[in-house]
Amino acid sequence: MKKTFLPIFLVILLASYALGNPQITFSKDWRPGKK
């Protein structure tokens, strides 16, 4: 149950974070861990 819930939770969390920070763009300059 949790194995299927966790990825969905992460996607929702990431989406809400992106919506809360409109200046963040997922361009070629964006990489995991880069701020």
Curated annotation (Swiss-Prot):
Origin, by domain of life? Eukaryota
- Which region is the signal sequence? 1-22
Keyword Transport in the entry? The reply is no
Mark the residues carrying the PTM Proline amide: 32
Which UniProt keywords are given for this protein, alphabetically ordered?
Amidation, G-protein coupled receptor impairing toxin, Pyrrolidone carboxylic acid, Secreted, Signal, Toxin
Coiled-coil annotated spans: none
Where it mainly occurs, coarsely classed, is secreted
Molecular-function GO term, any one: toxin activity
User: In which tissues has expression of this protein been reported?
Assistant: Expressed by the venom secretory cell of the spine. The spine is a cuticular structure containing a single large nucleated venom-secreting cell at its base. It is an independent unit capable of producing, storing and injecting venom. On the back of D.vulnerans caterpillars, spines are grouped together by 50 to 100 to form scoli, of which there are eight in D.vulnerans.
Residues where Pyrrolidone carboxylic acid is found? 23
Identify the GO cellular component terms for this protein. extracellular region
Q: Extra info from the record? A: Extremely abundant peptide in the venom (almost one-quarter of all toxin-encoding transcripts, and the highest represented peptide by proteomics methods).
The UniProt function text for this chain reads: Potently activates insect GPCR. More precisely, it activates the ACP receptor (ACPR) from the mosquito A.aegypti (EC(50)=3.07 nM) with a potency comparable to that of the endogenous ligand. Has no activity on receptors of the closely related neuropeptides adipokinetic hormone and corazonin. In vivo, does not reveal any observable effects when injected into crickets (A.domesticus). Does not induce increase in intracellular calcium in mouse DRG neurons, suggesting that it does not induce pain.
Protein name as annotated: Z-limacoditoxin(1)-Dv4
> Which organism does this sequence originate in?
Doratifera vulnerans (Mottled cup moth)
Q: What is the lineage of its organism?
A: Eukaryota, Metazoa, Ecdysozoa, Arthropoda, Hexapoda
